[in-house]
Curated annotation (Swiss-Prot):
Catalyzes the attachment of threonine to tRNA(Thr) in a two-step reaction: L-threonine is first activated by ATP to form Thr-AMP and then transferred to the acceptor end of tRNA(Thr). Also edits incorrectly charged L-seryl-tRNA(Thr). The keyword Methyltransferase does not apply. The gene is thrS. Zn(2+) binds at residues 332, 383, 509. This is Threonine--tRNA ligase. The keyword tRNA-binding applies. It comes from Wolbachia sp. subsp. Brugia malayi (strain TRS). Pfam families: HGTP_anticodon, tRNA-synt_2b, tRNA_SAD. CDD domains: TGS_ThrRS, ThrRS_anticodon, ThrRS_core. One of its GO terms (biological process) is threonyl-tRNA aminoacylation. Its cofactor is Zn(2+).
Length: 632
């Protein structure tokens, strides 16, 4: 007898033998169902349930349901490619945010015409309504099969799978692929998709491995969702931070310093405004700002454990045969050194240590993307050294600070991913229980919605990831808070407790922006370059109609500069219409236009970005109003 608990209905049913999802779901539900969650594991509807279990039904409206449909689409694309290009070898085809891809080994170079042909073939396969059939194979059977059809990459994948793990394949029509699953019942469940582009990719991400061709696609629940997504992509192209940065003269990146940013005056002004804003928030919230070296001995990275884990992504400097130095990829071990510089008491805790730390990571050139992925970056990094019983209160304070910062920067939709204990971890279960409880209570107290990310915490502690949504609905993971029981112990950090004994502090790794570079890229695209007045690199340009107004414009400018306004004057002999177009294209929020009449009447003509309307105002009134607006 098998007892099945339907979690959504809180109902228990008993069955005399093994059953599948199709057996236990009502026909009207099974039509909409994509898969089952069986004791936390995703199952195909056709897969047998062998023992007592708890189940949830996964439907298309669920994120997991959509992810499965995208996985289906990847397999359908692979089948289409094999039918059109029989010599192509299929390698891997996972789902990604908003879509999927599949990598192919083939001598032929895919073209846009090929993508159209593949799409057409995919529609035929979808219309054929092939069932996705799961089969468990012996290792030898799988190796023999894929070897016989010339799929050497599949054989390579099989060789890397532990022998204790079952090998599963999925069959759809005549196409068979190695896959863990799950899949929906049939190909006809894929209702709306589009192939997007072709790119190069190395096998297993190794630059020394074979070069493959990656076809990207997107799939959605219906055509309306697909069209919304495609329109969003068009809007994203218009907002591309690299294009806007060129128009606004913010920064550039060049081959002689790949992955590193050349900040121009306007861009660096924006950078400094953001840094000053964050610094003020940190001071008001009890953080002490520190500065640590960029170049640090290998010995420290070995003690911290980063040498083994991050060495491939570190820039190494050989000072001598006996001594290696590394440009720091993160700040945390250095902050522990400051903590260790003298003996701390429990009365000193918590200690909130912040740094705008310049870090470098040797990212592959193919992964670099404008400001969004760079090799040299500055983190708004901070570490809180505290006692275990302070984890909750410090997390509550951090969540409040993060919400405040995001809101003032224009992001009001925030969600949280909570990653709990992985299978391999340090520390005992009681400590993890307390840490996880402290984080969850803090998130709830902050009024933030959260999603469980089971088993994805670091080995040294659970973590929170804060995700914001931008103006066109895209999600960006920026903020983090990570509990660390291990690093303080590894690096010998301790404080003296109330009982006079030594204790290791808990270390909270936290960031709000993540990196300045990436966050500025997000801000540029969120606002499409039209920053709020307080954040804009240049807040005001005073432009003259005639040379006779030059002195007047300069006098006003000097007064405003003394008040901290980021103001410029345009005293060139160009036509005023040209000046307006120029500074409007540079996204300057406010223009003041002055000519003979304005000089005589001590007024200015005010024009706001995005408006063709000009309003006359006394200079004194305009200055007072501006000074109110430029402050956040």
């Amino acid at each position: 007898m098998i007892r099945i608990t339907f979690l959504a209905k809180q109902k228990v049913e008993e069955y005399s033998s093994r059953v599948t999802g199709f057996d236990i779901l009502q026909p009207d539900i099974s039509k909409e169902a994509i898969a089952l969650r069986v004791n936390g594991e995703l199952y195909d509807l056709s897969r047998e349930i062998e023992s007592d279990t708890e189940i949830d039904v996964i439907q298309l409206n669920d994120e997991e349901g959509l992810d499965i449909i995208r996985h289906d689409a990847a397999h359908i694309m692979a089948q289409a490619v094999k039918e059109l290009f029989p010599n192509a070898q299929v390698t891997i085809g996972p789902t990604i945010q908003d879509g999927f891809y599949y990598d192919f080994a083939i001598d032929h170079t895919f073209t846009t015409d090929d993508l159209a042909a593949i799409e057409k073939k995919m529609k035929e396969i979808i219309k054929s309504n092939h069932r996705f059939i799961r089969e468990v194979w012996a290792r030898k059977q799988a190796i023999n099969f894929f070897s016989s059809i010339g799929e050497k990459y599949k054989v390579d994948i099989i060789s890397s799978i532990p022998e204790s793990e079952d090998l599963t394949v999925y069959r759809q029509g005549d196409f068979v692929d190695l896959c863990r699953g799950p899949h929906s019942p049939s190909t006809s469940r894929v209702k709306a998709f589009k192939l997007m582009k072709v790119a190069g990719a190395y096998w297993r991400g190794n630059v020394k491995g074979p070069m493959l061709q990656r076809i990207y696609g997107t799939a959605w629940r219906n055509k309306d969702e697909l069209n919304i997504y495609l329109k969003r992509l068009e809007e994203a192209k218009k907002r591309d931070h690299r294009r806007i940065a060129k128009d606004m003269d913010l920064f550039h990146i060049q081959e002689e310093a790949v992955g590193q940013v050349f900040w121009h005056e306007q861009g660096y002004t924006l950078y400094n405004v953001l840094e000053s804003y964050i610094r003020k928030k940190l001071i008001n919230n009890g953080y002490a700002e520190v500065k640590t070296p960029i170049l640090v001995s290998k010995e420290l990275w070995e003690k911290s454990g980063h040498w083994d884990k991050f060495r491939e992504n570190m820039f190494i400097v050989d000072e001598s045969e006996s001594k290696k130095l590394a440009i720091k990829p993160m700040n945390c071990p250095c902050h522990v050194q400051i903590f260790n510089s003298y003996t701390r008491s429990y009365r000193n805790l918590p200690i909130r240590m912040a740094e705008f730390g310049m870090c470098h990571r040797n990212e592959s050139s193919g992964s670099l993307h404008g400001l969004m992925r760079v090799r040299g970056f500055t983190q708004d990094d901070a570490h809180i050294f505290c006692m275990e019983e302070q984890v909750n209160s410090e997390t509550v304070k951090f969540c409040a600070l993060l919400k405040e910062v995001y809101s003032e920067l224009g992001f009001n939709e925030i969600s949280v991913k909570f990653s709990d204990r992985p299978n391999v971890r340090a520390g005992d279960n009681e400590v993890w229980d307390r840490a996880e409880k402290a984080l969850l209570e803090a998130v709830k107290e902050a009024g933030l919605s959260y999603e469980l990310n089971p088993g994805e915490g670091a080995f040294y502690g659970p973590k929170l990831e804060f995700i914001l949504k931008d103006a066109i609905g895209r999600s960006w993971q920026c903020g983090t808070l990570q509990v660390d029981f291990i690093l303080p112990e590894r690096l010998g950090a301790f404080y003296i407790g109330a009982d006079g004994q030594k204790y290791h502090p808990v270390m909270l790794h936290r960031a709000i922006l993540g990196t300045f570079e990436r966050f500025i890229g997000i801000l540029i695209e969120h606002y499409a370059g039209k920053f709020p007045l307080w954040l804009a690199p240049t807040q005001l340009v005073i432009l003259t109609v005639t040379n006779e107004a030059d002195n007047y414009a300069t006098e006003i400018s000097n007064v405003l500069k003394e008040q901290g306004v980021r103001v410029k004057t345009d005293l060139t002999n160009e036509k005023v219409s040209y000046k307006i177009r120029l500074h409007s294209s540079n996204k300057v929020p406010i223009l003041w236009i002055v000519g003979k009449n304005e000089v005589a009447s001590k007024t200015v003509s005010v024009r706001n970005l995005g408006s063709e309307k000009q309003e006359s105002s006394s200079c004194e009134k305009a200055v007072k109003l501006l000074l109110k607006k430029v402050l956040i």
